[in-house]
Amino acid sequence: MEWLWLFFLHPISFYQGAAFPFALLFNYLCIMDSFSTRARYLFLLTGGGALAVAAMGSYAVLVFTPAVCAVALLCSLAPQQVHRWTFCFQMSWQTLCHLGLHYTEYYLHEPPSVRFCITLSSLMLLTQRVTSLSLDICEGKVKAASGGFRSRSSLSEHVCKALPYFSYLLFFPALLGGSLCSFQRFQARVQGSSALHPRHSFWALSWRGLQILGLECLNVAVSRVVDAGAGLTDCQQFECIYVVWTTAGLFKLTYYSHWILDDSLLHAAGFGPELGQSPGEEGYVPDADIWTLERTHRISVFSRKWNQSTARWLRRLVFQHSRAWPLLQTFAFSAWWHGLHPGQVFGFVCWAVMVEADYLIHSFANEFIRSWPMRLFYRTLTWAHTQLIIAYIMLAVEVRSLSSLWLLCNSYNSVFPMVYCILLLLLAKRKHKCN
C-alpha cells in the first residue's frame, strides 16, 4: 500500500488532508449553531492563514499581499470601476510571480521550490475568486461595502465590513484547490445553518474516498505500463502514439484524484452540492465529471467539462466580453493565467483551433449522416480521435522543455490535430461559400 501513502504525501494532498479535521469541525459547529456569523468568518480566515503559512512558508506573503490589496480596491472603488482595477492588479501580480518561476526554470536551470509552486497554484485560485467577486459587484449581484474606506467610520467598522471579503478570498477549504465557489454561495453558507445531514455527509465522503482509492489503483497500473515502455525521446513512429496516450492517461488520473480530494474538503466544510441554494443562486459545479469526460466524442464538450468551474469562470470573464475571436481570446487568456510556458501557449492555441474545428465538423456530420450504423461508426471514430487530440494537447501543456515540445510536434501524434486543421479549412471555406 506504499502507493496510497505516496498520494497522501504529495505536498498539496498532505495539506488538504491535514485541513480535513478542521473542515469537519467547522461544519459541526455550524450544525450545532455554536458560534456567531463573525466567528465563522474568522474561523475560515484564520484557518486559511494558518494553512498558507504551513504549506507555503515565507512565500505565503505572495498570497496575502494581493488579497489585502484586492479587498482595499473592492471597498474603495465604485462598482463600475472595481472589476477593471482588481483584474489588472491581480493578473499583473500573478504574472510577476510566474516570471519568477520562468527565471528559475529557464535561466538558472534549477528546479523551483515546492512551496513556491504551491504558492503559484494558490495564487491562480485567488485570481479566480477576486475576479469572480469583482464581476459580481460590477454586475450588481453583490452589494459593495457601503461607504468603503473613504467613509469616516472607525477602523474596527471598516474591518468588520471587509471581513466577509477577506474570509472569502482566503478561506481554507478552497485555498489550495477545489471548485470555484461564488461569493453568494459562500455568504449563504456562512450566514445560514447547515443543510448537510451528518449521515448523508458520511456516505458522500465515503463514496469520494472509494473513488480516490479506485483512481489511485488505476494510476499505479498505468504508471507501471508507462515506466516499462519507451519514452517520447526513444519511441519509434506509431509507438509514440501509444506513449502519448498512456502518459496523458496518467496525467488525467492524477487530476481526477486531486479534484475529488479537493471536492471532499469543500464538502466536509459544508460547501458541497448538498447545500440548499437560494433562488437565482449559482449551484455547485464539481471539477471532475469523469463519466462525461471519458465518453464524449466532442472536443468542445470535453473543454466545457474539464475543470468545469474554471471553464465557466473563463467563459464569464473572457468569452462573454469578447467581440472578436472570443474562443481564441479565451484560450489565450487561459495560457496567460497558467503562466505562459511555451508548451502552454502552443497547447492552448492548438486547443482553441480544435474546438473551432469541432463545431464545424459535427455540424456538417449531423447534417449528412442519417443512418444509425453510420452514426455509431462516426461516433466511435470521433471519440478515438478526440481522446488522441486531448492527449496531444495535454502533453504539450504539461511539458516544460522546448526539446520535449519539439519531440511531440515531430512525432506521429501531430497527424491527429493536423486532420482537424485541414477539415477546419475545408469546412470554413464551404461555409463561406454557402453564406
Swiss-Prot record:
<feature type="transmembrane region" description="Helical">
    <location>
        <begin position="41"/>
        <end position="56"/>
    </location>
</feature>
<dbReference type="GO" id="GO:0005783">
    <property type="term" value="C:endoplasmic reticulum"/>
</dbReference>
<dbReference type="GO" id="GO:0016412">
    <property type="term" value="F:serine O-acyltransferase activity"/>
</dbReference>
<feature type="transmembrane region" description="Helical">
    <location>
        <begin position="241"/>
        <end position="261"/>
    </location>
</feature>
<feature type="transmembrane region" description="Helical">
    <location>
        <begin position="377"/>
        <end position="397"/>
    </location>
</feature>
<feature type="topological domain" description="Cytoplasmic">
    <location>
        <begin position="27"/>
        <end position="40"/>
    </location>
</feature>
<feature type="transmembrane region" description="Helical">
    <location>
        <begin position="121"/>
        <end position="136"/>
    </location>
</feature>
<comment type="similarity">
    <text>Belongs to the membrane-bound acyltransferase family.</text>
</comment>
<feature type="transmembrane region" description="Helical">
    <location>
        <begin position="60"/>
        <end position="76"/>
    </location>
</feature>
<keyword id="KW-1133">Transmembrane helix</keyword>
<feature type="transmembrane region" description="Helical">
    <location>
        <begin position="6"/>
        <end position="26"/>
    </location>
</feature>
<comment type="subunit">
    <text>Monomer.</text>
</comment>
<feature type="topological domain" description="Lumenal">
    <location>
        <begin position="228"/>
        <end position="240"/>
    </location>
</feature>
<dbReference type="GO" id="GO:0016747">
    <property type="term" value="F:acyltransferase activity, transferring groups other than amino-acyl groups"/>
</dbReference>
<comment type="function">
    <text>Catalyzes ghrelin acylation at 'Ser-3' using preferentially octanoyl-CoA, hexanoyl-CoA and decanoyl-CoA as acyl-CoA donors leading to ghrelin activity. In vitro also uses acyl-CoA donors of different lengths from short-chain (C2) to long-chain fatty acids (C16) knowing that acyl-CoA donors from butanoyl-CoA (C4) to dodecanoyl-CoA (C12) are more efficient compared to longer acyl-CoA donors, such as myristoyl-CoA (C14) and palmitoyl-CoA (C16) that are not efficient.</text>
</comment>
<dbReference type="GO" id="GO:0005789">
    <property type="term" value="C:endoplasmic reticulum membrane"/>
</dbReference>
<feature type="topological domain" description="Cytoplasmic">
    <location>
        <begin position="77"/>
        <end position="82"/>
    </location>
</feature>
<feature type="topological domain" description="Lumenal">
    <location>
        <begin position="1"/>
        <end position="5"/>
    </location>
</feature>
<keyword id="KW-0812">Transmembrane</keyword>
<dbReference type="GO" id="GO:0016486">
    <property type="term" value="P:peptide hormone processing"/>
</dbReference>
<feature type="topological domain" description="Lumenal">
    <location>
        <begin position="102"/>
        <end position="120"/>
    </location>
</feature>
<dbReference type="GO" id="GO:0018191">
    <property type="term" value="P:peptidyl-serine octanoylation"/>
</dbReference>
<feature type="topological domain" description="Cytoplasmic">
    <location>
        <begin position="137"/>
        <end position="206"/>
    </location>
</feature>
<feature type="active site">
    <location>
        <position position="338"/>
    </location>
</feature>
<feature type="transmembrane region" description="Helical">
    <location>
        <begin position="408"/>
        <end position="428"/>
    </location>
</feature>
<dbReference type="GO" id="GO:0008374">
    <property type="term" value="F:O-acyltransferase activity"/>
</dbReference>
<feature type="transmembrane region" description="Helical">
    <location>
        <begin position="83"/>
        <end position="101"/>
    </location>
</feature>
<feature type="transmembrane region" description="Helical">
    <location>
        <begin position="207"/>
        <end position="227"/>
    </location>
</feature>
<dbReference type="Pfam" id="PF03062">
    <property type="entry name" value="MBOAT"/>
</dbReference>
<feature type="topological domain" description="Cytoplasmic">
    <location>
        <begin position="429"/>
        <end position="435"/>
    </location>
</feature>
<feature type="transmembrane region" description="Helical">
    <location>
        <begin position="341"/>
        <end position="357"/>
    </location>
</feature>
<dbReference type="InterPro" id="IPR049941">
    <property type="entry name" value="LPLAT_7/PORCN-like"/>
</dbReference>
<protein>
    <recommendedName>
        <fullName>Membrane-bound ghrelin O-acyltransferase MBOAT4</fullName>
        <ecNumber>2.3.1.-</ecNumber>
    </recommendedName>
</protein>
<dbReference type="GO" id="GO:0030258">
    <property type="term" value="P:lipid modification"/>
</dbReference>
<keyword id="KW-0256">Endoplasmic reticulum</keyword>
<dbReference type="InterPro" id="IPR004299">
    <property type="entry name" value="MBOAT_fam"/>
</dbReference>
<feature type="topological domain" description="Lumenal">
    <location>
        <begin position="339"/>
        <end position="340"/>
    </location>
</feature>
<keyword id="KW-0808">Transferase</keyword>
<feature type="topological domain" description="Lumenal">
    <location>
        <begin position="398"/>
        <end position="407"/>
    </location>
</feature>
<feature type="transmembrane region" description="Helical">
    <location>
        <begin position="325"/>
        <end position="338"/>
    </location>
</feature>
<feature type="active site">
    <location>
        <position position="307"/>
    </location>
</feature>
<keyword id="KW-0472">Membrane</keyword>
